[in-house]
Every structure is written in C-alpha cells, then in structure tokens.
Amino acid sequence: MLTNESLELILTKSQRCQRNWDLSRQIKEEDLQTLKTAVTNCPSKQNVLFYKVIFIQNREIIEQIHRSTDSFTYNFEPRKATTNAQILANTVAVFIRDRDDALGPRTEKEYAEGTTNGKIDIDEFKAVGIAAGYLNLTAHMLGYKTGFYGAQHGHDTLLEIFGKQYVFCMLGIGYPDETKHRRDHHFNPTLEGLKDYRYSSLSKQVHVEEWK
C-alpha cells in the first residue's frame, strides 16, 4: 500500500513534462491495459460520453505528429520555435471528441436540444481534463514519465491523420532517457544547432484553503 509520503512524491513528479525518451523499450501490455482502464472509468457529468482515446505506438505516426509541433517559442523577436518533444514518447494518447447519438437525454438541455447539440462544451472540457488527469497520474503510479501537448498547431497534419475529428489534447507516456535532464530536447545536442538547449520550466502557486 502506498504511504502518504510516497504518494505525494508521485503527485509532485506527475506535473513535470518529460522531453526525451528511451525508445529501446516498450510499454508493457498489462500497463497499457491499466492506462485504458484509467480513461474509461473516470467521472463525467451524468456519466455522459464526451471523448474517445487513441493510444498510438506506431513510430511513423508519432514522428509525423511531432514534426508538426514546432510551436514551442523560445525567442519572441525574431520568432524562434522548436518542437514539443514530449510527443516522441513510447506511446502517445490522443483525446478526441466522441458523442454517442444513440444515448437518450440525461439533462434538461439534452432533452430540449438533442443529445448532440444539448451537450455543454464546458462539461465536455471538464470530462476530458479529468480523464487526462487520471491517465497522467496512473502512468506515473506505474513508473512512467509523461508530457502533455495541447494539439493547437499542425492542423493540416492532424487532419491528415485523424480526419475531421476534433483533437482535445495528447499525452506522451514512456520511459525517460536516463542520460539526459528531463527538460533537454530529445534530439539534443543536434537540435537546430542549439547546443545544450533546455526547455524552460515555469512554476505556479495554487492557493488552498481549509474551512472547518
């Protein structure tokens, strides 16, 4: 059983984005099944279906997606950007919109407007956020590293791969390259001539209150 101390350590590490990977290894099949359980057994409003998840291990597709992610800006003027290397992970989980028209209405809005148009977008994004969080934490509890990608760029590539399906976000999951700092680009030191380039790391201060 996990102790509070060990769980807090996992929670702390789970927020960190891994930027390089050991691609000589593969995600264990039993772990992949557990990751699938994580995204299919998390809460959503009225247990409504909002998304589906594609777990990609095909390296050709993963590298195609990665090439389209040159949106991490490290210099604003003149603009210089590099790719989001977290997408080069051993496995990439892609969250895609999925609305089951066969479901009957579960809310008043769905009853009035139909089960497709009646869904509230904010409920959809909440559901995806919860599922992505479940997946991220589960991956870390299994011993993997992760990195989120918002999938807001490279639309032509996403259209080619996924068709007109709406992509919410992606999560790279896998084994880290133990020879590098986690924020070193996967392709360093050959990355665009940027020797020793390291992604920046930002912090946040979440205010927590306790009312008794």
Residue ranges: model-predicted function:
Residues 1-100, 208-212:
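N-terminal amphipathic, basic helical "cap/leader" segment at the start of enzyme domains
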Residues 2-19, 168-212:
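C-terminal helix-cap and adjacent tail motif
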Residues 39, 93, 109-160, 171:
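Small-aliphatic-rich amphipathic alpha-helix that forms the alpha element of a beta-alpha
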Residues 44-47, 138, 179:
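Short glycine/serine/proline-enriched coil/turn segments at secondary-structure junctions
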Residues 73-76, 166-171:
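Short hydrophobic/aromatic-enriched beta-strand-loop microsegments
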Residues 161-165:
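Aromatic sugar-binding interfaces of carbohydrate-active proteins
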